[in-house]
Amino acid sequence: LIAVVYRYDPPGRKKEFRPWDAKRRKMAPPEPRPLFNQPGLVAAETVVLTEGEKCAQALIGVGVVATTAMHGANAPVDKTDWTPLQGKAVLVWPDRDKPGWEYAMSAAQALLTVGAASCDVLLPPDDKPDGWDAADAISEGFDIQGFIASGPRMCIKPLNTVRSQEATVWATDDALA
């Protein structure tokens, strides 16, 4: 046991999360923050990264290998241990909202930095409501396997792979190509 995240959904209030660090034996997130479902990640070639434990658990419940960072879209990407996803094909399934998209983009770069084999961000359908997520998809009978296999997606490349044109521009004596 690395950590536990207690989720509370008090009536009429925002959901609350309270992490427990098993090693330090206190109510605080561990450093670095572990990914959810680590035993399930070990043998997987492809993993779906969601925005929270509820969505990851819903996907696991229908046979999809899934994980999430502690605190979902509010996760400090730089404090998360992404190394269990090295060498894996990762599909990021964001919630259909601005925080979900921003989290997907920053998590994708972190994944590529630690050596994920590939990283694609699934594009939620345009006709779904704001905030729609993997758990909603499952509850409404959405074709999860079809969406994961061939749904619209954006292939993410590392930011540092932009080729500089400096060598080609300055390779001549007068700097005019």
Which role fits each region the language model picked out?
Residues 3-5, 30:
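Short capping micro-motif at the N-terminus of alpha-helices
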Residues 32-43:
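A short acidic-Thr-Gly-centered motif at the start of a beta-strand
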Residues 7-21:
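Short, surface-exposed, low-complexity cationic segments
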Residues 155-177:
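The Walker A/P-loop phosphate-binding site
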Residues 18-19, 47-49, 177:
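Short, conserved beta-strand segments within well-ordered enzyme catalytic domains
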Residues 19-33:
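Short N-terminal or domain-adjacent regulatory/targeting segments
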Residues 2, 11-12, 23-26, 43-47, ...:
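TOPRIM fold recognition
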